[in-house]
Structures are given as C-alpha cells and as structure tokens.
Amino acid sequence: MATKLQDGNTPCLAATPSEPRPTVLVFDSGVGGLSVYDEIRHLLPDLHYIYAFDNVAFPYGEKNEDFIVERVVEIVTAVQERYPLALAVVACNTASTVSLPALREKFAFPVVGVVPAIKPAARLTANGIVGLLATRGTVKRSYTHELIARFANECQIEMLGSAEMVELAEAKLHGEDVSLDALKRILRPWLRMKEPPDTVVLGCTHFPLLQEELLQVLPEGTRLVDSGAAIARRTAWLLEHEAPDAKSADANIAFCMDMTPEAEQLLPVLQRYGFKTLEKLAVSG
C-alpha cells in the first residue's frame, strides 16, 4: 500500500548534528518525493538526508525532455558542490524516465530512479485489470509502455494522466483540504467501467500523499501500489556495496530553488519529516 503522511507528532530525527553519516540526496520537482524519502528513512534512519525540490520549474510532467535533463543535472551538481553525496534518489517518475543516463554518466555516486510499479501490480491483480495513475508525460513516454509490455502483457492496463492530482497533493501539504469531487472527476473513466481496475499503480511520487482520499473514491478493496519500499531497499543495497564514503555530521536540510512564500509555508511540514531548515539553492544556468 502507499505510505501515509506522518502526523504532527513525528520527532525531528536530525534536530542536532551527530556523528558523520552517509549523505543521501532525495530530489523531486515538488514535495511528492517526500513519500519516497519517508520509505527510505524508515528503513535507513541514520543517514544524513538532503531533500531538494524544484519549485521554479514545477511541475516537470508538462516540460520537454531536454529541459528536464539539463535542469536535473544542474540541481544535483549544485547540491554535490555543497555536500559530497554518497547516493542520489531522483524521486520523480518524469525526471527518472529521461535524466538517469545523464546523471550516471556525470557522477561517480549511485543514482536511483523511480519507475511505475507495473511489475508488482501485475502480480497482485485478481481481475487482470491494472490502473496506472500518473502524469500525462509518464503515461505517454515509451519507457512506460515498454514496462507494460515486459511485465504486464497479460493484463488489461487502463492509464490515466493527470497534472491536477499533482497540484492537489501539493495543496494538501500546504494544509488545504483535498476535494473528493475533484478526484471523482479525474477518476471518472475508471469509476464508469463495468469492471474497474482492482489494482492501481501510483505512477507519480505525489500520489501516495493522496492515498487516504483515493481509497475513499475508488471501489472498495482497490489496492494501491507504489515503488517507495523497493526504492528504499535498492538504496540500502547500493549504500552497502557501491556508494563512495561521503559523510556529513550536519543536520538534515531541505533546499528549494526559490524562497517564495509558498515554499516558506512548507517548513513546518519539512520539519515533521526530519529536516531542520529550508534554504534556497543557488543553481547555475
């Protein structure tokens, strides 16, 4: 199942500097990557975490591929110049599908991407109908269709691309209520089906943040599947076997690309996730 938001009583795990720990960057265009970070942190609580989100170019789902690749490389480079990294997680499905080759060519540390959890969903479905809920960019990309052909060719795949759901997830973290009517409208093609998907892949890292609302709207018993736990396990393996010795004793920190009022409003949320401060990251280009 998708991960749930932490409640307000979650302790700040890195409130004070401690012994040097491996430094891991988790990056997304927005705050959806916090769902992936949360899975990694639960498995690996004793790391030095950096969360970076690109609130200047958000959302990536509507941007062209060349722009995304250049932008992601610039941001990871800027973080690496401040904190030598043991590993980076691109916690954005859109960015992962286009930028991983460039990142892995440029940097010596491991880079982990996020891909839609098509394979486990194909194993879990009972009625053979799997829904893929993602951004329009992820739904259209050939990489997604290759995953389906490879791992779910015996399933009926129903795809929905939505930029509005990304905005709903961002708004939720800003303290706004999520409109169930808006979700029903987005999901209407599935809700009208005689036999809708019994398993839904959350193919955007923002969407686990809407798990509770999605379960209220989708038919009872619908399974929600995301790749957060698998990314956490992959991160643990790479840190043990392939990551360079890049450590820091600093507190966990979050970076935005522009310190807007909206970004400042996220500080209490980020602190609940264990990040002590939010700073603007200077990015060249």
Swiss-Prot record:
Keywords from the named record: Cell shape, Cell wall biogenesis/degradation, Isomerase, Peptidoglycan synthesis
Record-stated family: Belongs to the aspartate/glutamate racemases family.
Enzyme nomenclature, EC number: 5.1.1.3
Pfam families for this protein: Asp_Glu_race
Associated pathway: Cell wall biogenesis; peptidoglycan biosynthesis
Annotated protein name in UniProt: Glutamate racemase
Amino-acid positions noted as binding substrate in the UniProt annotation, renumbered to this chain: 28-29, 60-61, 93-94, 205-206
Lineage: Bacteria, Pseudomonadati, Pseudomonadota, Gammaproteobacteria, Enterobacterales
GO biological process terms, semicolon-separated: cell wall organization; peptidoglycan biosynthetic process; regulation of cell shape
MF-aspect GO terms: glutamate racemase activity
Reactions mediated catalytically: L-glutamate = D-glutamate
Active site, UniProt feature: 92, 204
Role, per record: Provides the (R)-glutamate required for cell wall biosynthesis.
